């Protein structure tokens, strides 16, 4: 049986490969058909934000299967469940920052409305799935996990409002967006 460190490294490489596939394959497929990579990246970002909580839970379940037999449901199992909460929270913030980057960068490419549509939809579904997934997967214990996530979901929402205000004031300053 491979060592625990080796199994965790393999797991993180697998997560990275999944994220790259989710972003790059649809983006380049849409570029091939639409000849517009920014549209493809926006679409892929929304897919990533929708699937990120699901991927986090799936990969944490695999991590639990790796660690929990050694921990025998002791202190380390609680640590693993807190990793799950941090993974969800960090995933939400990173996916939002990526969406904000796409919004700001796409202004010069003239596809801001499509980017706002896809990233906004993906971001809202991401928040919804983060609020609902712990309860659906873990029942009453999941409700406690969701409560732990609340400050990070609020921080993510504040980031969304900040970027929205920035875009609004940039538009008012004479910078226009077009399709």
What positions do the PLM features span?
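Transmembrane alpha-helix entry/boundary detector in multi-pass membrane proteins
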Residues: 6-13, 38, 67-89
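Canonical alpha-helical transmembrane segments
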Residues: 22-31, 55-60, 90-105
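Hydrophobic cores of alpha-helical transmembrane segments in multi-pass inner/ER membrane proteins
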Residues: 17-25, 91-95, 155-168
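Cytosolic juxtamembrane helix at the C-terminal end of the final transmembrane segment
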Residues: 26-34, 100-112, 162-179
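Loop-to-transmembrane helix junctions at the membrane interface
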Residues: 81, 95-123
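Cytosolic juxtamembrane helix and N-cap/initiation of the first transmembrane helix
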Residues: 2-55
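Interfacial non-cytosolic loop connecting adjacent transmembrane helices
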Residues: 2-4, 62-80, 128-152
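Hydrophobic alpha-helical transmembrane segments of polytopic
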Residues: 14-17, 41-49, 85-88, 92, ...
């Amino acid at each position: 049986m491979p060592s625990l460190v080796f199994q965790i490294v393999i797991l993180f490489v697998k997560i990275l490969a999944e994220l790259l596939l989710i972003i790059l394959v649809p983006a380049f497929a849409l570029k091939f058909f639409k000849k517009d990579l920014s549209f493809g990246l926006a679409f892929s970002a929304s897919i990533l934000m929708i699937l990120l909580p699901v991927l986090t839970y799936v990969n944490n379940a695999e991590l639990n299967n790796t660690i929990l037999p050694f921990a025998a449901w002791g202190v380390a199992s609680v640590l693993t469940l807190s990793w799950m909460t941090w993974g969800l929270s960090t995933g939400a913030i990173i996916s939002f920052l990526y969406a904000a980057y796409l919004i700001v960068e796409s202004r010069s490419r003239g596809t801001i409305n499509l980017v706002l549509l896809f990233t906004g939809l993906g971001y809202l579904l991401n928040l919804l799935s983060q609020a609902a997934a712990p309860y659906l997967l873990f029942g009453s214990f999941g409700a406690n996990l969701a409560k732990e996530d609340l400050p990070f979901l609020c921080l993510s929402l504040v980031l969304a409002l900040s970027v929205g205000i920035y875009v609004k004031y940039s538009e008012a300053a004479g910078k226009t967006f077009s399709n």
